[in-house]
Amino acid sequence: MEHNNNPGTPQMSSEFPASTTQTSSSAAAYDNSSHFEKEQSLMRWEQDLKLRERALANNQSAADITGPHVVVPAPATAHPRQANFPSSYPMIRLNLEEDIAIREYRQIVKFGIFVFLWEAAALVYNWVVSIGTIVYSAVDNFFLALFYMIVGVPTLYFLTRKLYRAASVPERARKSYAYLMALLGVVLFNIIFFVGFKRSGMNGLIWVISLFHNDHNAVGAMATVSLFFWFVGVFLTIALFIMYLRLNNTKRQRGEIQNAGFREYIKSR
């Protein structure tokens, strides 16, 4: 049976059915339309993003020009506090009310300053007594006492400054307990000077007995005053150690400061 093709009608190949060809062309058209819509959406999103960035930049520049300038203060530790003592020629910082917030620690520092002045006076007077011993050919005693005074007074000063700084930040256990360990050395220092070995530059008990035994009564009387200085110094330094350690432990147990105990500090060394 013959198939007649009308003129003007497109001739379809028998290998590709009409339905398949129409479906493929429709899918291609849909894909092209989908890609076009995505591109348009991306372009709109990008344009919107640029507009927002431009508006944000304009607002920022306007705020910089017309808005208030806020100056953020630096931390307190960035700039050291100015010296204020003595007032005529300030060399050190001494302001208990501003630097030490806790009242009990201010009292400890005041007592520590008194102990420093007492110990410094004891060292100076110890050297004065040794001047009198030169008459009895105890020249070595004089130079040793001079050495103790030159080294001891600055050392005691720096220890007192350490107490001042530790009381300013009592929550830092390392500073507090480092001072207490150094203070134990000062206690031992006073005990040795109180004993006072002969010709050692320490005008204490043994040296006083020796002076009176050899009928050096005048110098012996001066050395007795030095002995009194060291006797009182022993109790002052022990009292300072106990007061500061007890205050630290009390504040720690109450939760007012957060630091480790003295035993934990010793174990960590």
Swiss-Prot record:
Residues 1-35 are annotated as: Disordered. The chain crosses the membrane at residues 111-131, 139-159, 177-197, 225-245. Its main location: membrane. Induction: Induced by srfA, during development. Down-regulated in grlA null-cells at 16 hours of starvation. It comes from the Eukaryota. The keyword Transcription regulation does not apply. It is found in: Membrane; Spore coat. GO terms for cellular component: recycling endosome membrane; spore wall; trans-Golgi network membrane. Belongs to the SCAMP family. This is Prespore protein Dd31. It comes from Dictyostelium discoideum (Social amoeba).
